[in-house]
Every structure is written in C-alpha cells, then in structure tokens.
Amino acid sequence: MDEIFIASLCKNGILGGAIYVDKNHITYRTNKLTVSEKYRNLKMPIKDIIEITSGRMLFFPTVTISLKHDYKYKFIIFNKKKFLSTMNELRHS
C-alpha cells in the first residue's frame, strides 16, 4: 500500500512537501534547498512509531508523529483522516 499525502513539516516555519507512506516507512520530502538535508528526505520507520496524535494549528489539521529516542515531528496534512486511517491499518496489521 503506497500512499502520498500533501504535507508541510512544522520545523522552523512551515516547510511544504509531501509524505510518502509504504508498508515499512513514512517519508517526508521537500525540495527546499534552504532546509537541512535531514529534513529534505526524512524517513521514519513505521516500527519506530510510538504514537500518532492529531490536532490543529490555527485552522490547519495537524498530525504529530512520536518516534523512539524522543523524536517528534509535527506535520500539517490536508487529508488527515485518510492519513490516520492508513497509519492505523499499517501499524495494526
């Protein structure tokens, strides 16, 4: 199951890009050259996800992904409901 979601990473501003979901990883990608290489192609193994929470930033839908080793990443995701459904399927299959 490969899915693509339009998303922005909330890290030192709002960094537009996309989240790619496959059966093993969530990968956030942006083409902004002013962003650290770490965040231009941020790969998060699904097995390392501890928690996914949803919320809002102003009126935008957000998702916070908490990983092992105290890493947390907040994203604005425009199809949040579908993203959460996809993640629920992957994490519990």
List the predicted regions and their residue ranges.
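Short, surface-exposed, charged/polar-biased interaction segments
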Residues: 1, 26, 47, 70-73, ...
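Anionic N-terminal interaction surfaces
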Residues: 1-24, 37-42, 78-80, 85-93
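Short, surface-exposed polybasic-and-hydrophobic patches located at secondary-structure transitions
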Residues: 3, 60-76
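Phosphoinositide-binding peripheral membrane targeting modules
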Residues: 11-18, 23-66
